[in-house]
Amino acid sequence: MDKVIATPGGTNEIIRKYNLKLHKGLGQNFLIDQNIVDKIINTADLNNEDIVIEIGPGIGSLTQKIVPRSGRVFAFEKDKRLVKVLRELFNGYNHLEVIGQDVLEVDWKHFFDSRGISDRSVKVLANLPYYITTPVIMGLLESNITFSLMVLMVQKEVADRMAAAPGSKDYGALSVAVQYYGEVEIFHKVPPTVFIPRPRVYSSIIKIKPHSEPVYRVKNEGFFFKMVRAIFQQRRKTLKNSLTKSSEIKLDKGIVTEAIRELGLDPRIRGEKLTIKQMAILSNTLWYKISEEDGENHEIY
C-alpha cells in the first residue's frame, strides 16, 4: 500500500474499495491524522530488532508505519473482514502476521513459546476500542509476560485514571492496578476530529513500562486487590469503615484498627489517600493478622 492510509482520503478510499460498514459494537474508529500516528510511533521508539504486538489494527493506519520500522509484527484483529483487508494491503511484508483472533482470548505464554519469542523484546502498540481498554491492558499486565513497553491510544478519562496520583479525584482501583504492574505516562491529548467516524470523547496516548521486577511485594495478590476494590468502593468512607463494611471484603474491626495503628496512619484517613506502597504494606499486615487467627504462619514482606 503506497498511499498513506491515515488521511481522510486514504481511509475513505479503502472503505469504498472494500465496501466496509463500520461495526459500532467493535468500537471501530480509524485514525486519519498522520501526525498522531507519528506521535505514537515516536513514543514507542521502534527499531528493526523490535517485535511488535499491534492490537486492533483496523485498516492499517498504524500498521503502515510500524511494519517498516520493526523486526516482526503480529497484528491481532477480531473483525474477519478487516483481516482480509490487512492481508491484501500488506501482502509484501513477510515479517507481518495478521492474526484473526480476539486478543482477550490469547494465551500469551503459549503464543510467545510457539514462535520462539523473548517477551522482554516485545512492544505493544494499539489504538484500543474504548469498550475493551481495561480488560486488554489488565490481561497483558497480569499475564506474567514482561513486555518491553506499551504505547496505547485510550479514552482520555481512562488514561487520567490510570496515571492518577494518590488523593486526586481520578485515583482509584484502576490507578492502583495499572501502577502496581508498571509506570504510566500520558503523552498527548487527541481530539475526536482525527478519527473516522468521530468518537464523542477525547483520547490520550499513554506509555506503560512494565516493571522488570516486582516493586510492591504483596503476600497474596488476590487479597491485595480485593482490599483495593474495597477501599475505593465507597470513597467517602474512612479506611477502617471501607475494610469492615464493604461487600468485597469484611474484616474484623479490631484487626483493621490494630493494623492502621501499626502503620502509623491517622485512624480517620480515607483509603484514597494511601500510596500503593502503603496499600501493599497494609495488605501484608492484614494478611498476616488474619493468618495468625487461622493458626497459619504467613511471612510478611
Curated annotation (Swiss-Prot):
Keywords: Cytoplasm, Methyltransferase, RNA-binding, rRNA processing, S-adenosyl-L-methionine, Transferase. InterPro entries: KsgA/Erm, rRNA_Ade_diMease-like_C, rRNA_Ade_Mease_Trfase_CS, rRNA_Ade_methylase_Trfase_N, rRNA_adenine_dimethylase, SAM-dependent_MTases_sf. Pfam families: RrnaAD. The keyword Transmembrane does not apply. S-adenosyl-L-methionine binds at N29, L31, G56, E77, D102, N127. It comes from the Bacteria. One of its GO terms (cellular component) is cytosol. Belongs to the class I-like SAM-binding methyltransferase superfamily. rRNA adenine N(6)-methyltransferase family. RsmA subfamily. This is Ribosomal RNA small subunit methyltransferase A. It comes from Halothermothrix orenii (strain H 168 / OCM 544 / DSM 9562). The gene is rsmA.
